[in-house]
Amino acid sequence: MMRETGRRLLGIGARARFAAYSLFEKKSSGDSNFAPGAEKYILKSPDGALEVTVSDGRLTYSAAVGKTPVIEPSEIGLLVQGGVNLGENAVLGEPKTDSREEVRRDPDTETDITDRHINYIFPVRSKKFRYSLEVRIWNDGFGFRLLFGKDTGLLISDELTRFNVPGDTVCRYQTDLKKMQGKTLTQKTSELSQSEVFSCMTAFEFPGKSIYIMITESDIENYPGMALRSLGAGRFKTELWDTDKFFIKGGKTPWRIVTVCRSLEELVHCRVITHAAAPISDKIYENADWIRPGKSAWSYFIDEEHSRRFEKIMEFNALAQEAGYEYNLADNGWRDWAKTERGAFKKVKELVDDAEKRSVGIWLWQSAMDKVWFTPYRRRFFKKCQTLGIKGIKLDHIESETQFMTEFYRRFAREAAEHKLMVIYHNPQKPTGLRRTFPNVMSMEAIRGLQCKADADNDTILPFTRMLGGNADYTPLCFSVPRCLNEVSICHMLASAVIYNSAFFTVSEDPSILKAHGLDSFVSPLPVIWNETHVLTGSKIGEIVIFARRSGNRWYAAVFNGSQSERKINLPFSFLKDSAKYEAEIYTDNLTDQRGYNKVKITVTSADSADIAMRPSGGFAAVFREI
């Protein structure tokens, strides 16, 4: 219902507004000076290893690493009114080139990261129409988009851009376009079927060549989201899956992104999606000390009825305080605390007052299917939340990528920031770099998390696919609910809390249960900011993940075993600081009891290692505290 509403609104707007604009009547400024350039341009990354070729005629691009093609010649096209394809009969002008190296603070690692890229802007003439093609190349990927003059009006009926991937690769994809919670499937690219539609963040591995690519998008503004329609044998077409015709005036298309990494270590550090997003430009984010990462207690996952019981959420205030969590999330059901919304908000005020005494902040759930669509109600809602002392909003049930909805993500985040409210999105679109533009967007779901039950096989893929988009609200650790634990071990669950990062970290297990099982000493001090991350030797997509991560002077190690068989590995502690001693708190699988685990504390140095035996779908977790 929500998606169809968006389509109707967009259709009316497009017809009403388009009457004022003509596709061909206006030419961009300086058009008379357009000078054709070469028929083909070979563009290089800053390190020279990645080459992107752009050709005119039928506008196409391709890419290669060394002598290995990673994208074969593929069309860039946009179908507008009158059946005109802007990529046909295209003539490229000489590009403007800009090399940049920008250093900025990353809020999720609290370190400086470098955005080093070369940017090319080509003027393009296509019949009587003028626009620009922007191509940006990083060492670990590239993107392209179309730019239009401010007076250009377009009624877009389809995007014809393609991504042709070599068939001798392995494809990893899922087909849940609404929520990105589908099971990740693995198949030879040459054997992919025709007409199936994949979500973005579809990834490809080049066997024997240590090359990994992923196709997605970034920086969506006034444009619907895309998916990938398989045409068979590694050929894909952009699919604007959640919209019909739509109108834009001026502006730009989203970045069409291809990440290109040459190791798993490089892959998990790839920031291309974030780099491509528009930087912060709003003064409301200056001195934003109200944006505070942290862990949150969450009663809903253990029992959905908990959120409807005011006394239970009050109890979780105390549990959050005892566990050292920064937040407590009141999920779906809080409006049942009274007969009216006004009465429910009075109860929320009681909850907030109690939480403040305990140095705990309250987050509040809100459905996108509710009245927040309407600007007056949404603004009153935000104002009320700020007045009550709410710290953040969990917006749920989105499940759409219409032009209206992708704009709603941005509008909701900005208006929330005006009231000093953080945000997470559930059942949302793919991650597209929103956190860079709107730093109060702490996380989003868009992942097959614990809600869909633990999946050891999937867990050995997602750190190398979905996590390239940034924070994911996986909601880890709920082992007391059998359907969530599924076949994985307790140590696999602990590892998920280390490997999946989220600035708003929702702990789905009851803190009292964690304490009763002796796991609070690991979970309570668990950081949500990781200053350093490494993929360790032995990791293999779809089989095993071995991570080492540092926060301050503490190191963590975590392992996912994706196999249905026991697995033994030797884990060197060489990631630790040389000449330092650490107290290691180590958690290993009980090989005969899925719900059991072994815990030891020993003193180690970087010269030491551990022999680890894991259950089928098992895992390993350890924390190293410098002494």
Predicted feature residues:
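Carbohydrate-binding surface patches
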Residues: 540-578, 620-621
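N-terminal accessory beta-strand-rich subdomains and adjacent acidic, glycine-rich linkers
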Residues: 30-279
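Aromatic- and carboxylate-enriched substrate-binding clefts and catalytic-loop regions
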Residues: 332-489
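An acidic-aromatic substrate-binding cleft motif
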Residues: 251-327
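Catalytic cores of secreted or luminal carbohydrate-active enzymes
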Residues: 491, 495-534
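C-terminal beta-strand-rich structural cap/linker in extracellular carbohydrate-active enzymes
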Residues: 602-627
